[in-house]
Amino acid sequence: MNRRYEKPPPLSVSSKGKKKHFVNHTAPNTPGNYERTQTSPTLSTARSHEPDDKLNYEIFSILESKFLFGYEDPRLLWIPQSPLRPGDSEAGPSPRSPLTPNGVVLPGTPSSSFRSPRGRICVLSIDGGGMRGLLAGKSLIYLEQMLKEKSGDPNARIADYFDVAAGSGVGGVFAAMIFATRDGNRPIFKAEDTWKFLVENAEGFYRSGSGSGGGGAGAAIKRVIRSGSGSGSSSVTAATAKLEKAMKASFADLTLKDTLKPILISCYDLSSTAPFLFSRADALESDSFDFRLRDICRATWAEPGTFDPVRTCSVDGKTRCVAVGGGLAMSNPTAAAITHVFHNKQEFPAVKGVEDLLVLSLGTGQLFEVNYDYEQVKNWRVKEWARPMARISGDGSAEFVDQAVAMGFGPYRSSNYVRIQANGSRLGACGPNVDTDPRAENVKKLTEIADEMLKQNNVESVLFGSKRIGEMSNSEKIEWFASELVIEQQRRSVRASPTVTLKQAVSKTNRNAINATLTLISKDR
């Protein structure tokens, strides 16, 4: 997955060997038109991966079909269909069926109707967002609590029940924490440790009273526009040193191979001007793709204006990147995680489509500072637009991914895909620096908003219809999701063929023994 991440052009696709060509037939090969080869240009050492981005191509095909033809015409649009159940017919579901004639899952539908006989790959995605990561941390704590309750195992951890985790920014750090291991058997950190980590280190990472204002893409834009300067100041250097110290204390010399399951953590590589994904699957194949977890977390959290960029390299020194924050690359990494599952046939051989996935995406809240009306904004200049543009850029990109993924799931979007997101707050507008304010008052307010978020009704994305308020609260959705995770793990023990065949890392002791043996063999020759 160490690759440049691009949206495929929607017109035509032709394949030649292991490269995918996307061609725009409406214009000649001039700058700005498509006649390009999608390879893995991020790294000179990158291996050849599956060429076509299945989920993204289907998503953008849906978008094209909608705007050109209208999505209601089934002849012009692919939408995944659930298998017919007793009482259904080709003409449509029976009255008792949880599907409407348009293929939409009715609220409250038991997901047992949609459980794939092949099993489902369980995917966790965590957004970036600076101090707003406290909301995702609270969701993780509640999820782990529910897993313990549903499984009856007081030692249950999130890593026991998910097959893949992806994160950006602070979400990437959380993903690394809950999947990191020292003994190859149990995770080092509990879910509550993620929340504590952010609270305890916030004052060292962020400056009280800072006007920088945010984590993720929007926040970075805001800091650059407002300050007119980037890294290099004494305050940024001090914050960077504290971040590196905290990461070293948490992860020591653990690498991507020292994680229990596949993880994906994003950053933006300035040297190749492309998003970069650190992937455990790649690390297990070559040391050239194995990075230290402390360097990965440093890279994904390198928010411009708050922390310095970082030059990081693989454990063998052959692969390098100059990284800034993962939120600039993808503030919501859900689509990247799903695409990884579709492409990783070695570890997920049974996956055929979205019906074989069970995805939980944790947002960090849409916490608007203030609402605007037309009369207020119509005469704004660049200075007045700086803050709203930053917020729109950050939150808007994350929500677009949510909308696109929901469309990709079609009728399975209520049974196989859950997004947990704060839908505003009754506690009043947040301050302009909510994402970077480490003071106790801001931590207290974010904690209260997180508790309020769990009580709010879950908001679902609807096909080209904005949002829909669901019948279940976010806490009820998480509880339901935990039940599904436990059921999936129980069913795996009785299936004839494995749902997941995870590659195992070779221990350092075994690696040294293997290297010593190879050295002796070479000497004998």
Swiss-Prot record:
It is an enzyme of class 3 (hydrolase). Keywords: Hydrolase, Lipid degradation, Lipid metabolism, Plant defense. One of its GO terms (biological process) is lipid catabolic process. Residues 124-338 form the PNPLA domain. The keyword Membrane does not apply. Residues 1-50 are annotated as: Disordered. The keyword Transcription does not apply. It holds the Pfam family Patatin. The active site is at S168 (nucleophile). GO terms for molecular function: hydrolase activity. A motif (GXGXXG) lies at residues 128-133. Residues 26-46 have a biased composition (Polar residues). Its EC number is 3.1.1.-. InterPro entries: Acyl_Trfase/lysoPLipase (IPR016035), PNPLA_dom (IPR002641). It comes from the Eukaryota. Specifically expressed in roots. The nitrogen atoms of the two glycine residues in the GGXR motif define the oxyanion hole, and stabilize the oxyanion that forms during the nucleophilic attack by the catalytic serine during substrate cleavage. Possesses non-specific lipolytic acyl hydrolase (LAH) activity. Hydrolyzes phospholipids as well as galactolipids. May play a role in disease resistance. PANTHER family: PATATIN-LIKE PROTEIN 6, PATATIN-LIKE PROTEIN 8. Belongs to the patatin family. This is Patatin-like protein 8. The lineage of its organism: Eukaryota, Viridiplantae, Streptophyta, Embryophyta, Tracheophyta. The gene is PLP8.
